[in-house]
């Protein structure tokens, strides 16, 4: 009689051999060779739905979209699965933009981040109608020029530099020494200062070719505790509130809470571990009704590569 031991949702052992879903790993290696990376479509879909459900429960004030980072997995079949599940796509390079477009993602849910973005890349982003996150003050004139030349409206978000005053636990993102997270967040993550965001925001609001849809902040994977995310959300919410006040009561439609999780690879964490801090930190008056974008949910929401 066969002895079966379930490891998790997609892995099990049968008579001492590893099975992935209903596939014998030994048979797979015999067919395709080794090393072999195997991805479970069912597990990818389960992961995406766990995140989507958990974040939606934590944010009842408007729609929530999960935007996995394209750089985590460029395989077109995986990207098509994510698009089919209603995800967006967080991208940086022209190549990643091509992957996202070919996979069939909703263009309004394709988010272009990072510096530097060259003129050709920005022009293509405007032409395709994807969201552009402005990471530096030099990008806005290029976006304005591309929008004017194409007769289109470019939709943008402004990236605020993270600030975590007083969070002195050492950053897990920095390998060289015990660097406090509040310092690491400023040193290792890009973005615009408060004054720069306000100045760019005023310029955009006076410009008919560019539409400001919201704000972005990349939080990184500095610390595994949920307290880190509580403090990040509180700080981000307060900063967005200050910016909106300085812009005369501007109401953002989208808030992009991009970031990675400093987590162990196994076993799977509960998605609620990371969605619950949103309820504590991101509820403020200007945020009601906006769209929450959870960007860069990489490992758990995209794939579980298995090699044996």
Where are the regions that the model predicts?
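Active-site beta-loop-alpha junctions enriched in small/polar residues
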Residues: 43, 69-75, 94-95, 115-117, ...
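Active-site/ligand-binding-proximal alpha/beta "capping" segment
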Residues: 160-213, 217, 226-238
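Short glycine-/acidic-enriched loop or helix-start segments at secondary-structure transitions
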Residues: 100-101, 122, 143-144, 167-168, ...
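Glycine-rich tight-turn/loop motif centered on a GG-T
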Residues: 33-37, 107-108, 127-131, 170-191, ...
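A charged N-terminal "starter" segment
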Residues: 1-155, 175-176, 202, 207-211, ...
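Residue-level signal for pocket-adjacent positions within structured domains
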Residues: 6, 185, 256
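Glycine-centered flexibility sites
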Residues: 86-88, 104, 114, 184, ...
């Amino acid at each position: 009689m066969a002895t079966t031991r379930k490891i998790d949702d997609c892995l099990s052992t049968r008579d001492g051999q590893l099975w992935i879903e209903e596939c014998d790993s030994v048979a797979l290696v015999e067919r395709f060779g080794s090393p072999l990376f195997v991805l479970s479509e069912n597990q990818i879909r389960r992961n995406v739905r766990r995140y989507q459900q958990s974040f939606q429960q934590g944010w009842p004030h408007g729609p929530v979209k999960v935007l996995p980072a394209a750089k985590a997995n460029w395989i077109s079949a995986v990207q098509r699965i994510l698009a089919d599940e209603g995800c967006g796509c967080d991208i940086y390079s022209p190549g990643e933009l091509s992957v996202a477009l070919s996979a069939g993602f909703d263009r309004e849910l394709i988010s272009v981040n990072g510096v530097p973005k060259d003129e050709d890349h920005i022009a293509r982003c405007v032409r395709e109608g994807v969201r552009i996150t402005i990471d530096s003050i030099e990008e806005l004139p290029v976006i304005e020029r591309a929008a004017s030349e194409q007769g289109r409206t470019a939709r943008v978000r402004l990236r605020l530099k993270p600030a975590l005053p007083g969070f002195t636990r050492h950053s897990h993102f920095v390998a060289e020494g015990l660097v406090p997270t509040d310092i690491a967040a400023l040193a290792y993550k890009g973005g615009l200062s408060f004054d720069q965001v306000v100045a760019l925001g005023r310029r955009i609001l006076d410009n008919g070719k560019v539409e400001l849809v919201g704000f972005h902040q990349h939080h990184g994977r500095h610390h595994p505790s949920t307290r880190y995310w509580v403090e990040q959300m509180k700080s981000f919410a307060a900063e967005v509130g200050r910016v909106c006040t300085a812009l005369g009561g501007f109401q953002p439609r989208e808030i992009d809470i991009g970031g990675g999780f400093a987590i162990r690879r196994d076993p799977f964490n509960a998605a609620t571990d990371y969605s619950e801090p949103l309820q504590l930190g991101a509820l403020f008056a200007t945020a009601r009704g906006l769209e929450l974008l959870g960007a860069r949910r990489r490992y758990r929401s995209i794939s579980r590569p298995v090699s044996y």
